[in-house]
Amino acid sequence: MTAEQHAGPGAETRCGFVALIGAPNVGKSTLVNALVGSKVTIVSRKVQTTRALIRGIVIEGTSQIILVDTPGIFSPKRRLDRAMVTTAWSGAHDADLVCVLLDAKKGLDDEAQAIIDKAAAVAHQKILVVNKVDLVPREKLLALVAAANEKLPFARTFMISALSGDGVDDLKQALAAMVPPGPFHYPEDQMSDAPMRHLAAEITREKIYSHLHQELPYQSTVETDSWTERKDGSIRIEQTIFVERDSQRKIVLGKGGATIKSIGAQSRKEIAEITGVPVHLFLFVKVRENWGDDPDRYREMGLEFPRE
């Protein structure tokens, strides 16, 4: 069905890009998945999970909302950190609307205040989205909303729980009305602009985050080397997990290969659920010293390589 058929004769379609910005772990990826109604971006309790711009696509009435899940904004130290923060702000400046997410529990901490201050320079309508409202008393929420709007007057304010879904539909309807008039950019059955091989790599990276609780996840990356559709309808996927040292490789493998087997089993199951076909996943772990300084790895992640 085309956008015009979906909208009905004479109905005006709308389409626009909406960037979600905020501190790490504020719930941007969870919100994108809740709005889309399907998993298009990985979610982890660890900060800095999202590294590149991931777009989720939502149809609401006669509007197509293209959500841009940006990396969390923080004080960058490593080259990779700088690339992620630069990518986040470029996503905000390139969008039609900007949703500034705040964590209701953390309130207007230094990180949140710095983001709001910088968001003032973005020349688009800005929407305040206070997430995790189920964890905070209403009086504290109202004070937080008032303080945030005093720093930067927002076009709209929403209080939501991305995890439970409370308030998400109201936000979706508002975004549908606020994106500019125009034709749909993507087919109506498309939920993300990320290729499946990229999402598959992200899913495996998510499983690394959930299995390994030290710094290792931040010093690793995953690439899909091959994606082959077999005659029986199943998919064969080969992926490489890059780490910086041999000691890290041993951690990923685990005793007798137990850790990598568990990571692979969970990743395989989730990829199969998303694709709807059986998946044969083969994982390899390789040491690539200083991969965080390799321009090719940045291109694979969809990031611009910082020269300094």
Swiss-Prot record:
Membrane topology (UniProt): Peripheral membrane protein
Domain KH type-2: 212-289
Swiss-Prot/TrEMBL keywords: Cell inner membrane, Cell membrane, Cytoplasm, GTP-binding, Membrane, Nucleotide-binding, Ribosome biogenesis, RNA-binding, rRNA-binding
The Era-type G domain, residue ranges: 14-181
Localization of this protein: Cytoplasm; Cell inner membrane
Coiled-coil stretches noted in the UniProt entry, renumbered to this chain: none
Function: An essential GTPase that binds both GDP and GTP, with rapid nucleotide exchange. Plays a role in 16S rRNA processing and 30S ribosomal subunit biogenesis and possibly also in cell cycle regulation and energy metabolism.
Protein's UniProt name: GTPase Era
Organism of provenance: Bradyrhizobium sp. (strain BTAi1 / ATCC BAA-1182)
